[in-house]
UniProtKB/Swiss-Prot annotation:
The gene is dbp5. The keyword Ribonucleoprotein does not apply. The keyword Repeat does not apply. Associates with the nuclear pore complex. This is ATP-dependent RNA helicase dbp5. It comes from Neosartorya fischeri (strain ATCC 1020 / DSM 3700 / CBS 544.65 / FGSC A1164 / JCM 1740 / NRRL 181 / WB 181) (Aspergillus fischerianus). Residues 110-283 form the Helicase ATP-binding domain. Belongs to the DEAD box helicase family. DDX19/DBP5 subfamily. It catalyses: ATP + H2O = ADP + phosphate + H(+). A motif (Q motif) lies at residues 77-105. One of its GO terms (biological process) is tRNA export from nucleus.
């Protein structure tokens, strides 16, 4: 059975991975009964959600230009055809994966082929990309001896501690029947604790911590076979994270298989990724198919910054219908809103990067369990976190790019896409509300509408009964109509 190396102290109540219970093998069938309303994917009790299978075409570009990407060798319709270890197949079956998703159909043969080749994959959240790279990592590790079981062979990097913990949970569930599998976490620890030596076959972590552990020789990387970057665009585009990723890669074996996955790949990041993972096979969705279906996009006019806060308080009753995330631009804003709303008797929590790791873990776990309904966050949560109960996202501050050389304020389209993607997950219905309090914010909202060729509906805050009616109807609807179409290059 798979085990997790206790590299970090888990908070009471458990991390996602800690809360995953292994099924009783005596009652476990090889093919579990299909879950209602679920096509593929890990059920909620195993830390997963339904897969979202939108209508899209998967485009494949092979590094070998003489090869035919439409050859059946580069596609698969069932997991059994991949020649997987039966114990991995059993893990997939217990996660309720009955057949590969569209992305997995094309990605898995390329990932698992020998000799290993690099892969750059662009696929929106909820399409099975995490399961694809985890399955590849499980298939690549050698667990034939006790020494190899304690030797890092696959490294998965994520931009945030929260996403790393989520991926670690997927590895543990998928590998739960693999004897000798040990999983380690290389994520920031509380200030008073020191990371222990990693003795595991698969490591999930963040770039900064991994780099530090390699320098301290608590992580020996010389036997690594696979390097995965999830949300790769975010890591390669951010100066700090990008530099850390480059430094980590420079310390790894030169023949390592590099796998990059992300929901978005702006052109300049794609060029960077091509250098980070040279001669890679590429899998992409057509740009116009980068959709977030089922999200009703609204905006509210606010007189000024103070009116923004009053509007948020006015919305509080609606925020707790399901779970909600309020996105702000700065840590100071998150802390100030939390302080004021708590003083007024509202139950909210904030999640920002400077909090101690154990506190961040506890907050995320409370939010997943529904004990905390309203979360105030900076962009630390905009990437990849799957919480199926989120029904509303508030853009208290419209996301913007800081480009001193460009006149005026510029909306950050990719962050907007990732933010509103926290709701309406896996085909569910959700609401996104943006606050607009001045002309510059109005211009940024228009930039978003133009880029994504979508209409964001104005709601008149003078009539709060109407506001409540619109939002409640949207959340209760089985389907939301507006399409969030892909934007321009």
């Amino acid at each position: 059975m798979a085990s997790e190396q206790p590299v970090e102290a888990a908070p009471t109540g458990g991390s996602l991975a800690d809360r995953i219970t292994k099924p009783d093998e005596s009652n476990t069938s090889e093919t579990p009964a299909p879950a209602a309303d679920q096509t593929d994917g890990a059920p909620a009790q195993l830390g997963g959600s339904d897969l979202h299978e939108p209508e899209y075409n998967v485009e494949v570009k092979l590094s070998d230009l003489q090869a035919d990407p439409n050859n059946p060798l580069y596609s698969v319709k069932n997991f059994e055809d991949l020649g997987l270890d039966p114990r991995i197949l059993k893990g997939l079956s217990n996660m309720n994966f009955r057949k590969p998703s569209k992305i997995q159909e094309r990605a898995l043969p390329l990932l698992l082929n020998n000799p290993p080749k690099n892969l750059v994959g662009q696929s929106q959240s909820g399409t099975g990309k995490t399961a694809a790279f985890v399955l590849n990592a499980l298939s690549r590790v050698d667990l034939s001896t006790e020494q190899m079981q304690k030797t890092p062979q696959a490294l998965i990097l994520a931009p945030t501690r929260e996403l790393a913990r989520q991926i670690l949970g997927v590895v543990q569930v998928m590998g739960q029947f693999v004897d000798g599998l040990i999983i380690g976490a290389a994520v920031p620890t509380d200030r008073d604790s020191r990371p222990k030596r990693l003795e595991c076959s698969i490591v999930v972590g963040t770039p900064g911590t991994v780099g530090d552990m390699i320098k301290r020789r608590t992580f020996i990387p010389n036997k690594l076979k696979v390097l995965v970057l999830d949300e790769a665009d975010n890591m390669l585009d951010q100066q700090g994270l990008g530099d850390q990723c480059i430094r980590v890669k420079a310390l790894l074996p030169r023949d390592i298989q590099v796998v990059l996955f992300s929901a978005t790949f702006p052109e300049h990041v794609h060029q960077y990724a091509s250098k980070f993972a040279p001669n890679a096979n590429e899998i992409t969705l057509q740009h116009e198919e980068l959709t977030v279906e089922g999200i009703k996009q609204l905006y509210l006019d606010c007189a000024d910054g103070e009116d923004k806060y009053k509007t948020l308080v006015q919305l509080y009753g609606l925020l707790t219908v399901g779970s909600s995330i309020i996105f702000v631009q700065t840590r100071a804003a998150a802390q100030e809103i939390e302080k004021r709303m708590t003083a007024e008797g509202h139950t909210v929590v904030s999640l920002t990067g400077e909090r101690d790791p154990s506190v961040r873990d506890a907050i995320i776990d409370q939010f997943r369990r529904g004990e905390a309904k309203v979360l105030i966050a900076t962009n630390v949560l905009a990437r990849g976190i799957d919480v199926s109960t989120v029904s509303m996202v508030i853009n208290y501050d419209i996301p913007e790019l800081h480009q001193p050389s460009v006149p005026g304020r510029q909306a950050d389209f990719q962050t907007y896409l990732h933010r509103i993607g926290r709701t309406g997950r896996f085909g569910r219905v959700g609401v996104s509300i943006s606050f607009v309090s001045n002309r510059e914010e109005w211009e940024m909202l228009n930039q978003i509408q133009t880029y994504f060729n979508c209409e964001i509906q104005r709601v008149d805050t003078k009539d709060w009964d109407e506001v409540e009616d619109i939002i409640k109807k949207t959340i209760k609807n089985s389907r939301a109509n507006p399409k969030f179409a892909g934007g321009k290059e």
